[in-house]
Design a protein with these regions (language model features):
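Phosphate-binding and adjacent anionic-ligand microenvironments
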Residues: 10, 14-179, 185-203
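Cysteine protease catalytic core and zymogen-processing segment of caspase-like enzymes
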Residues: 1-11
Length: 203
């Protein structure tokens, strides 16, 4: 999605809001900031992105699972659209996908990501879980200060270096999902270890 955003702005000259789910990379935010574009964060589920697309002239919307949509297209996650857009990006740039990824990482990365699903033995009360995670919120994780906490969907700790850790119950399965994005693989591992310990305390 980050590659698509850069292409739409720099090659097509598009402007407008960017919408992403809470579990999607913050590289998008850093790139959008360079272009002075607003970013809206939604709960997980493309229906929340679609709500924005139906109300505003959204440039691009997407989620962690790979579903995206762009201005003028249907307000629904479309993997075929993403595939076609990637082909266009590669053709226009003359670069390989690997080189494009390296280039975007040099601009707004690096970013490493991991997700783990913890199987629940009993249902989790979402509000009770959220309150527990807020009450026990750490001052720092893996040596980075927690600078912001989002509760738009689960609880997301955002760190000073723009790394983040998200703990949220799945809306479709009896699992608790733990997500982390960090600047190094070691940072991601440390955040996941912390997140899984905390998540286990509420399962």
């Amino acid at each position: 999605m980050t590659l698509a955003l850069r292409h739409l702005v720099e090659r097509r000259g598009w402007r407008g809001p960017v919408v992403r789910t809470v579990s999607t990379t913050r590289m998008i935010d850093r790139l959008a900031q360079r272009y002075h574009l607003p970013v809206y964060e939604t709960p997980v589920g493309f229906n929340y992105i679609a709500d924005y697309m139906l109300k505003e002239d959204v440039l691009i919307g997407g989620e962690e699972s790979g579903g995206i949509s762009i201005r003028g297209h249907i307000p629904e996650g479309d993997g075929i659209l993403m595939g076609l857009l990637l082909i266009e990006i590669i053709a226009v740039s003359g670069s390989s996908l690997a080189d494009l990824v390296d280039d975007i990482h040099s601009q707004v990365g690096p970013a490493f990501y991991q997700r783990n699903d913890l199987r629940l033995v009993r249902p989790v009360a979402k509000e009770q879980m959220k309150q527990h995670l807020l009450d026990s919120a750490p001052a720092d994780i893996a040596g980075e200060t927690v600078v912001q906490i989002s509760t738009i969907d689960g609880v997301k700790y955002i760190l000073a270096d723009d790394s983040w850790l998200l703990i949220r119950p799945s809306g479709t399965e009896p699992v608790l999902r733990v997500y982390a994005e960090g600047r190094t693989p070691e940072m991601v591992k440390a955040m996941m270890n912390y997140g899984e310990r905390v998540a286990a305390s509420v399962t």
